[in-house]
């Protein structure tokens, strides 16, 4: 990650050492990388044009120009100027060298700067490795405690404007009393990439939680990668699983041992349990084991290999049933050919370690076409096609041969996939009986369970679940638009529940250039633990479209999903799981059922406080019981410990703004689908006002000092994130957004893992024409490509001669300013003249110069979800946008600038003003 741009409030902010989140300060005179006027500037660089003005440094001078009165809140120092592609000086030689103007670092108290450097040198950025907190005076109301919690650091949102770097800071640290865990392991508490709490200090009473107006919820992402090898967690292989007899919690690093280690006290419900006899025995070496080395007592994230009693039936094999649309639309846009080729080329990537993986294929137009594929080595290797035209009661012609074992039929599956396209190349059918195909597929795989993968370019228009073209341009942007986001046919909800009960999950890959009713179709993935992938206007004739889908679909097939899974969250007595959000079926009050457990989604669980909590620490434990794709039954357990408090200031000082925003994103989607878009937007604005008012009344003494807007440092990004949500494609008020695009966006807002959701709500923007010397090159320590510092999403940050990358994780825009110098165009695109530059979807050319390599490295690194600690199959399209080019494309890119006014919505300045008035 690129270092943030400078001093967060000089870190007394959270009551932690200065090293927390703040980069090492530069000596006051020079900004990093800015040689003094006379100095040689290190490595020789090509300079495209000098800067015509000398206010600030580079295009991003606005980031740190004027210090607030008093200068106490460290403003972000200006970007070090890379004398890069600057504004051409008319009449001057555009190749002359001009040294960069030195930037000035923010004033910081010497002690803070010193500490910052010490901690910076120690590499203390991981919140788990932070030294003990500086002691704050204990509030009177609170019983004396061993460790003070995070301190509240008030800031003014109006005089100290939001800086995008604040969104990259880690959440406020979880401060536990010494000796909370049974062994002093650095891995005892759950890392934020798996579970984040909206509150890292939990109110002891429901009334205090209510008073705070903050939500108490967990954001849970049990897997941080598509494959175990990319994110291994400790496995307990001995099948000795110790659980509390009463509340069924799993033994974890926060239990207490009693009676010379023969018994353990549950940290959730306080019951004393016996330690199993084999707990201290090493089955592999057949000798006594050291208990203090057991993974389940040292690691908050572990996986247990489950014994027989955790299985209702033998572990199910991995089953993929492909339902492929072969109607005219799907053949002409190249979907059928691309899908067949992609499956064929990905057969080796489909998990099959136990050699039990099974595949099946049903082609769909006005009839259902089943395929019987013989075993390799049979006399006849030809696949047989069986056509069923009865769509109301589809039956299975020969149930035995329609699902085949990949290992036994590998060669004949390849022969079949090679021929699939030819079979339908002359089709004229516009009908698509996908609902009937889903019913038939369910019949075929429900005895074993598995995944139905739907690939379709058409609206299901005959048979079960048939849908009609109901989008009406006249209702877009009005209150009636919300009805288009509801399901048009009850089949999609009732059938999804049936699927869930039979361990059948559905994924939708949708490719239509016309209305496809994503709102209805997305219900199937929503209730079966699947996902909806939407490719509007896709056509294989465009290389970029074909490559994007092929890469994503291949990664999708290779992903190590869990099967027949259930998720449950248990917690300390007094806490109760109240509401669950995400793609699954809520089978009972606290059990979420997943026929397949994906690796690229997150879930939100709201926690209620039913009775006063008397303990100094509460624990919340998530358990996912599942079958791996290799046929092994396992339980992944994630245990999070949080301190408690009776003090509202502690609650606010420890709130995690990104987790809070994730919770409200899920709430807003639920509200949009149940009540409509306007109520969802209003609820977000009301909540922002409520939080600001509560903070002012309860913690800022109710004063309206100088007309400011007070809010704690750790929550400064929240009002901006709320505005960005209201302006997101899924929720914003507009008469220009096709319903399918909106429905697909709502799917993302309610499933994306937290880092990707934050980027989808508030995209990243990087200035490339003047990026620092190190950007786009590997970091010397880690080897990871360094990104330039992100800049705020405001057109004020964009200069007319600049080159910018804007990336929301789903789509990337490369913005070329209208006055970009010819040298920049030549270096990046290999073209003599900007007029030759075509706009739209494309890949950047490989031009033989260092700057082109660095720009391409930044574009690629910005797509790298692994470095964000998440699994994802998405490969964003890159669109080249000229500021003076195609207006539709330019307007689309500008909707990403969420701090600007646009299309019926307010700017950030107006939004802050309206919040200030209402508070």
UniProtKB/Swiss-Prot annotation:
InterPro entries in the cross-refs: ADF-H/Gelsolin-like_dom_sf, Gelsolin-like_dom, Gelsolin-like_dom_sf, Sec23/24_helical_dom, Sec23/24_helical_dom_sf, Sec23/24_trunk_dom, Sec23_24_beta_S, SEC23_SEC24_subfamily
UniProt GO molecular function: SNARE binding; zinc ion binding
Residues bound to Zn(2+): 244, 247, 266, 269
Keywords noted in UniProt: Cytoplasm, Cytoplasmic vesicle, Endoplasmic reticulum, ER-Golgi transport, Golgi apparatus, Membrane, Metal-binding, Protein transport, Transport, Zinc
GO biological process, one term: COPII-coated vesicle cargo loading
Keyword Lyase on entry: no
Bias kind Low complexity: ranges: 1-38
Main location: cytoplasm
UniProt-listed Pfam families: Gelsolin, Sec23_BS, Sec23_helical, Sec23_trunk, zf-Sec23_Sec24
GO CC term (a single one): endoplasmic reticulum membrane
Domain of life: Eukaryota
Family designation: Belongs to the SEC23/SEC24 family. SEC24 subfamily.
Subunit structure: The COPII coat is composed of at least 5 proteins: the sec23/24 complex, the sec13/31 complex, and the protein sar1. Golgi apparatus membrane; Peripheral membrane protein; Cytoplasmic side.
Annotated function: Component of the coat protein complex II (COPII) which promotes the formation of transport vesicles from the endoplasmic reticulum (ER). The coat has two main functions, the physical deformation of the endoplasmic reticulum membrane into vesicles and the selection of cargo molecules.
Protein name as it appears in the record: Protein transport protein sec24
Native species: Aspergillus niger (strain ATCC MYA-4892 / CBS 513.88 / FGSC A1513)
């Amino acid at each position: 990650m690129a270092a943030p741009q400078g001093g967060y409030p000089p870190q007394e902010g959270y009551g932690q050492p200065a090293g927390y989140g703040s980069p090492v300060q530069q000596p006051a005179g020079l900004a990093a990388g800015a040689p003094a006027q006379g100095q040689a500037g290190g490595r020789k660089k090509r300079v495209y044009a000098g800067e015509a003005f000398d206010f600030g440094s580079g295009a991003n001078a606005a980031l740190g120009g004027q210090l607030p009165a008093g200068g106490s809140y460290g403003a972000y120092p200006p970007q070090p100027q890379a004398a890069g592609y600057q504004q051409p000086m008319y009449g001057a030689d555009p190749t002359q060298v001009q040294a960069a103007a030195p930037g000035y670092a923010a004033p910081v108290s010497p002690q803070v700067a010193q500490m910052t450097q010490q901690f910076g040198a120690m590499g203390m950025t991981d919140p788990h490795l932070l030294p003990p907190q500086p002691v704050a005076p204990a509030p009177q109301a609170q019983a004396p405690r061993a460790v003070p919690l995070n301190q509240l650091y008030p800031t003014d949102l109006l005089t100290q404007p939001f800086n995008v770097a604040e969104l990259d800071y880690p959440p406020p640290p979880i401060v536990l009393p010494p000796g909370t865990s049974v062994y002093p392991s650095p891995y005892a508490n759950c890392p934020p990439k798996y579970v984040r709490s909206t509150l890292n200090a939990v109110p002891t009473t429901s009334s205090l939680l209510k008073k705070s107006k903050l939500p108490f919820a967990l954001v849970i992402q049990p897997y941080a990668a598509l494959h175990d090898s990319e994110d291994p967690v400790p496995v307990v292989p001995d099948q000795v699983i110790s659980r509390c007899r009463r509340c069924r919690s799993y033994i974890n690093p926060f239990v207490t041992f009693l009676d010379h280690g023969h018994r353990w006290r549950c940290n959730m419900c306080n019951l004393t349990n016996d330690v199993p006899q084999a707990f201290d025995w090493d089955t592999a070496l057949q000798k006594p084991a050291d208990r203090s080395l057991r993974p389940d007592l040292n690691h908050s994230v572990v996986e247990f290999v489950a014994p027989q009693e955790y299985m209702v039936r033998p572990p199910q094999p991995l089953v993929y049933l492909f339902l492929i649309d072969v109607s005219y639309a799907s053949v002409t846009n190249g979907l059928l050919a691309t899908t067949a080729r992609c499956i064929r080329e990905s057969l080796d990537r489909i998990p099959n370690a136990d050699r039990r993986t099974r595949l099946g294929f049903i082609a769909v137009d006005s009839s259902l076409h089943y395929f019987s594929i013989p075993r390799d080595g049979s006399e006849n290797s030809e696949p047989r096609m069986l056509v069923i035209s009865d769509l109301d009661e589809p039956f299975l012609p020969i149930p035995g041969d329609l699902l085949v074992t990949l290992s036994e039929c590998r060669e004949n599956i390849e022969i079949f996939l090679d021929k699939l396209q030819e079979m339908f190349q002359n089709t004229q059918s516009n009908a698509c009986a996908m609902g009937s195909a889903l019913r038939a597929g369910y019949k075929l795989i429900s005895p074993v369970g598995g995944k139905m993968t739907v690939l379709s370019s058409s609206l299901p228009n005959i048979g079960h679940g048939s849908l009609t073209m109901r989008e009406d341009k006249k209702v877009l942007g009005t209150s009636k638009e919300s009805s288009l986001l509801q399901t048009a046919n009850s089949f999609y909800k009732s059938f999804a529940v049936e699927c869930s009960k039979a361990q059948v999950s559905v994924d939708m890959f949708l490719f239509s250039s016309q209305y496809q009713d994503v709102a209805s179709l997305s219900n199937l993935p929503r209730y079966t633990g699947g996902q909806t992938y939407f490719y509007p206007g896709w056509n294989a004739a465009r290389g970029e479209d074909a490559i994007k889908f092929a890469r994503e679909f291949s990664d999708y097939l290779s992903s190590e999903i869990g099967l027949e899974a259930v998720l449950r969250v248990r917690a300390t007595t007094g806490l109760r799981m109240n509401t669950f959000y995400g793609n699954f079926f809520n089978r009972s009050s606290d059990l979420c059922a997943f026929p397949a457990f994906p690796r690229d989604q997150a879930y939100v669980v709201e926690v209620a406080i039913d009775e006063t909590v008397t303990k100094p620490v509460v624990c919340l434990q998530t358990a996912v019981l599942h079958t791996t794709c290799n046929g092994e039954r396992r339980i992944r357990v994630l245990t999070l410990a949080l301190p408690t408090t009776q003090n509202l200031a502690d609650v606010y000082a420890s709130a995690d703004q990104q987790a809070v925003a994730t919770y409200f994103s899920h709430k807003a989607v639920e509200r949009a689908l149940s009540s409509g878009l306007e109520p969802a937007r209003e609820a977000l604005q009301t909540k922002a006002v409520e939080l600001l008012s509560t903070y002012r009344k309860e913690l800022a003494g109710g004063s309206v000092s100088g007309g400011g807007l007070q809010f704690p440092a750790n929550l400064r990004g929240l009002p901006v994130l709320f505005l960005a949500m209201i302006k997101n494609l899924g929720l914003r008020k507009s008469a220009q957004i096709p319903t399918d695009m909106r429905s697909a966006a709502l799917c993302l807002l309610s499933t994306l893992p937290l880092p990707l959701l934050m980027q989808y709500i508030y995209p990243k923007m990087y200035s490339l024409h003047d990026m620092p010397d190190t950007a786009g090159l590997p970091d010397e320590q880690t080897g990871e490509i360094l990104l330039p510092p992100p800049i705020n999403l405001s057109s004020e940050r964009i200069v007319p001669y600049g080159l910018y990358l804007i990336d929301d994780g789903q789509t990337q825009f490369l913005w070329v300013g209208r006055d970009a110098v010819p040298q920049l165009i030549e270096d990046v695109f290999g073209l003599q003249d900007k007029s030759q530059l075509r706009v739209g979807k494309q890949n950047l050319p490989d031009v033989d110069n260092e700057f082109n390599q660095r720009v391409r490295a930044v574009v690629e690194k910005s797509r790298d979800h692994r470095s964000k600690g998440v699994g994802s199959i998405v490969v964003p399209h890159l669109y080249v946008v000229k500021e003076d080019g195609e207006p539709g494309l330019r307007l689309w890119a500008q909707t990403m600038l969420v701090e600007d006014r646009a299309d019926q919505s307010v700017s950030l300045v107006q939004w802050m003003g309206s919040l200030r008035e209402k508070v």
